[in-house]
From Swiss-Prot:
Annotated source species: Yersinia enterocolitica serotype O:8 / biotype 1B (strain NCTC 13174 / 8081)
GO molecular function: ATP binding; ATP-dependent protein folding chaperone; isomerase activity; unfolded protein binding
Keywords for the protein's UniProt record, in alphabetical order: ATP-binding, Chaperone, Cytoplasm, Isomerase, Nucleotide-binding
Name of the protein in question: Chaperonin GroEL
Pfam families: Cpn60_TCP1 (PF00118)
Family label: Belongs to the chaperonin (HSP60) family.
Length: 550
């Protein structure tokens, strides 16, 4: 086992604080409308330019192991805030730095660290309650656009695009961000259910100019099995031909004789058919077939539940207004499914999302909800260079997370004002701890709540104390707009922060800061001295004389 380096008390805390400050100072320059960029060097390719706090934090690794421990713990604050709300990483880092700095001063002055932590926790619980009172619902497109604009660093086109996307696919809909091919940002909305499976044979194509298949008011056969024998399909094909409508077959696979016969029938115009593979694999495929069945009012023909293809009638088939199939995708538009049944299915999947443990499962279930509930929107980010594209895409993703958080828990006045109002309300209510040390902890937390506003002002090149005092003297959503350098009603000016983002930033900052204040000892590996490690193998050189043994 490697030897350890151990530091105690003040020695440990000073080292840890130095690491915290290096990381936080690098992150906090990005805060606010006039925050600066940070350039990250990559071992390959061009450097990345970012204004995203968590991206800066993730790059920092310090040489001194004790300082690095401090930096890594604050990095955790940014990561947790990012995971919970998708934004507010810089605010969380600034809050953590302030609580740790003030808290360690109090510890050095002889306060009890455990009581300080309890005081900080009391103040944070009270602040979260105050934030909930200050929160207003974010329901209309204008508010959503404003939140997106602020989060995307005052880029109003991004805010507008996100608001349009949410309007089209609903607040629960799936919105993805992709790299576009032009200079302008674009919004692409796919209505109806789309899945990533294309036609099984190009001979089904009936729109040669677009290379796609379009079926108007088709019947939809859903089969959870491979279809290779055409005989089991005959009753259904005859019934569909009599009805004079096209047929879409979605099955595990259609192959051999069955596929060949379907192609011949289509080319001769006897019955208009198209076949695609069912989306997904294994259990997920079964679930997605069931989703399509709910959407189109059909039944999944599965031998597991005793249904056979030969006995399938028109009643078992789903229907939709229109289906469009190309090489890679199938879109079912306006399924005839019962609205109540679709909502029931959506509620069932939402329950699964709550129970899911892995992010991948949650994402896939969320996609299924969107496909059933409204559709999918794709924001294509445009930029002149690859470096700008990466930076912009990260900003748009942040803005999207922020708007989702705003829809979930509402919004508060931005620019650090909400935390100042929460702190003022706690002071006015006269929150007290069980002893004097806890009271100091409460003061530490309340002072830290001013730090985001102060940092925004510093980054804008103004005097922090003057502006902080002016904002404190006001009430409600009165604050300072660092972008236009004027005071006023932040909500009226469209400067909003999602309540969830502000709340998460404060809670995670206080959680990690509390642990660091109560640290008394730090242990790390001593650097190993590898210089003598290779010396032992040198004595084998004499073996060369063994050639004469033959």
């Amino acid at each position: 086992m490697a030897a350890k380096d151990v530091k105690f008390g003040n020695d440990a805390r000073i080292k840890m604080l130095r690491g915290v400050n290096i990381l936080a100072d690098a992150v906090k320059v990005t805060l606010g409308p006039k925050g600066r960029n940070v350039v990250l060097d990559k071992s390959f390719g061009s450097p990345t330019i970012t204004k995203d706090g968590v991206s800066v934090a993730r790059e920092i690794e310090l040489e001194d192991k004790f300082e690095n421990m401090g930096a890594q713990m604050v990095k955790e604050v940014a990561s947790k805030a990012n995971d919970a709300a998708g934004d507010g990483t810089t605010t969380a880092t600034v809050l953590a730095q302030s609580i740790i700095t003030e808290g360690l001063k109090a510890v050095a002055a002889g306060m009890n660290p455990m009581d300080l932590k309890r005081g900080i926790d009391k103040a944070v619980i009270a602040a979260v309650e105050e934030l909930k009172k200050l929160s207003v619902p974010c329901s209309d497109s204008k508010a959503i656009a404003q939140v997106g604009t602020i989060s995307a660093n005052s880029d109003s086109t991004v805010g507008e695009l996100i608001a349009q996307a949410m309007e089209k696919v609903g607040k629960e809909g799936v919105i993805t961000v992709e790299e576009g091919s032009g200079l302008q940002d674009e919004l692409d909305v796919v209505e109806g259910m789309q899945f990533d499976r294309g036609y099984l044979s190009p001979y089904f194509i009936n729109k040669p100019e677009t290379g796609s298949i379009e079926l108007e008011s088709p019947f939809i056969l859903l089969a959870d099995k491979k279809i290779s024998n055409i005989r089991e399909m005959l009753p259904v094909l005859e019934a569909v031909a009599k009805a004079g409508k096209p047929l879409l077959i979605i099955a595990e696979d259609v192959e051999g004789e069955a596929l060949a016969t379907l192609v011949v029938n289509t080319m001769r115009g006897i019955v208009k058919v198209a076949a695609v593979k069912a989306p997904g694999f294994g259990d997920r495929r079964k679930a997605m077939l069931q989703d399509i069945a709910t959407l189109t009012a059909g039944t999944v023909i599965s031998e597991e539940i005793g249904l056979e293809l030969e006995k399938t009638t028109l009643e078992d088939l789903g229907q939709a207004k229109r289906v469009v199939i190309n090489k890679d995708t199938t879109i079912i538009i306006d399924g005839v499914g019962d609205e109540a049944a679709i909502q029931g299915r959506v509620a069932q999947i939402r329950q699964q999302i709550e129970d899911a443990t892995s992010d991948y499962d949650k994402e896939k279930l969320q996609e299924r909800v969107a496909k059933l509930a409204g559709g999918v929107a794709v924001i294509k980010v445009g930029a002149a260079t690859e470096v700008e594209m990466k930076e912009k895409k990260a900003r748009v993703e942040d803005a999207l997370h922020a708007t989702r958080a705003a829809v979930e828990e509402g919004v508060v006045a931005g620019g650090g004002v909400a935390l100042i109002r929460a702190a003022s309300a706690i002071t006015a209510a006269g929150l007290k701890g069980d002893n004097e040390d806890q009271n100091v902890g409460i003061k530490v937390a309340l002072r830290a709540m001013e730090s985001p506003l102060r940092q925004i002002v510093v980054n804008a090149g103004e005097e922090a104390s003057v502006i902080a005092n002016n904002v404190k003297a006001g009430s409600g959503s009165y604050g300072y707009n660092a972008y236009s350098e004027e005071y006023g009603d932040m909500i009226a000016m469209g400067i909003l922060d999602p309540t969830k983002v502000t709340r998460s930033a404060l809670q995670y900052a206080a959680s990690i800061a509390g642990l660091m204040i109560t640290t008394e000892c730090m242990i790390t590996d001593l650097p190993r001295d590898d210089k003598g490690a290779d010396m032992g193998a040198g004595g084998m050189g004499g073996m060369g004389g063994m050639g004469g043994m033959m």
